[in-house]
């Protein structure tokens, strides 16, 4: 399913890509924030909860985005089948078509309730750095790729993800009522909703943020303070230290799992 504003003008591009690969897909009209009336917005959104979590209000676009995806979760629940959700500015790698689309539903369901297939606002030129600084703590192999849990989960976008019926059930249950958080606040879905959120590596879905304008980002930038480059420079030594610790933990986990596997094999041989 592809979430798309009817007025966005983006549908032709992604429809051509999907049709080229013979993929069965449908567009779902996203809720248009520009059509909100003040009274309606107040009913659909809990500003106090949002400000308590983020220190700012959510934009009308962010609220509309959440409501749009919630409609899809309801469809997953009613159909009883998992779904891959894409936004209309998604760029798709070949592995999306040759691997991800043919993976068994039950195999993915054993790994998580939601599997993030990509990350918003990440350019391909920074892909290797992202994997280096944000390794998966624990992961399972599937078709030469990995699905696992990163050390840190954050608001990394919803440009592409897989969701199971169980995931849809949990998501709908804990987000019932007025919108009070960002759609892509994955730590919130994990902690408040009890959902298992995994990530695919390498990513197969990218956001065309460098070439396509976004209503949501334009609105959000007016409410979010910008940080200077000096801050990134000061934090770089901290990031390097954290990187070393994380990879040490990954190595320790791999050694422990290998030792456990070896012990199980010896026990079975007896």
Q: Where does each model-flagged region fall?
A:
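An acidic/histidine-cluster motif and surrounding catalytic segment
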Residues: 1-86, 90-270
């Amino acid at each position: 399913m592809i979430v798309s504003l009817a007025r966005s003008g983006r549908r032709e591009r992604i429809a051509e890509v999907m049709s080229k690969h013979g993929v069965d897909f449908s567009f779902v009209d996203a809720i248009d924030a520009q059509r909100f009336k003040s009274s309606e917005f107040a009913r659909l959104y809990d500003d106090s909860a949002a400000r308590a979590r983020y220190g700012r209000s959510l934009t009308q676009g962010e609220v509309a985005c959440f409501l749009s995806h919630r409609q899809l979760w309801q469809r997953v629940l009613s159909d009883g089948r998992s779904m891959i959700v894409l936004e209309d500015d998604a760029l798709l790698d070949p592995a999306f078509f040759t691997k991800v689309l043919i993976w068994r539903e039950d195999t993915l369901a054993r790994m998580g309730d939601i599997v993030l297939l990509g990350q918003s606002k990440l350019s391909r030129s920074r892909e290797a750095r992202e994997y280096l600084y944000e390794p998966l703590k624990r992961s399972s192999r599937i078709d030469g790729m990995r699905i696992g849990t990163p050390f840190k989960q954050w608001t990394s976008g919803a440009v592409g993800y897989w969701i199971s019926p169980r995931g849809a059930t949990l998501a709908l249950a804990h987000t019932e009522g007025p919108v009070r958080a960002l759609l892509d606040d994955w730590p919130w879905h994990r902690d408040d909703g009890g959902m298992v959120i995994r990530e695919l590596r390498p990513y197969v879905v990218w956001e065309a943020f460098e070439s396509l304008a976004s209503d949501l980002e334009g609105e959000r930038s007016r409410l979010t303070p910008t940080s200077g480059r000096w801050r990134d420079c000061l934090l770089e030594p901290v990031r390097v230290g954290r990187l070393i610790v994380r990879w040490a933990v990954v190595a320790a986990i791999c050694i422990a799992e290998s030792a456990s596997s070896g012990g199980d094999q010896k026990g079975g041989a007896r």
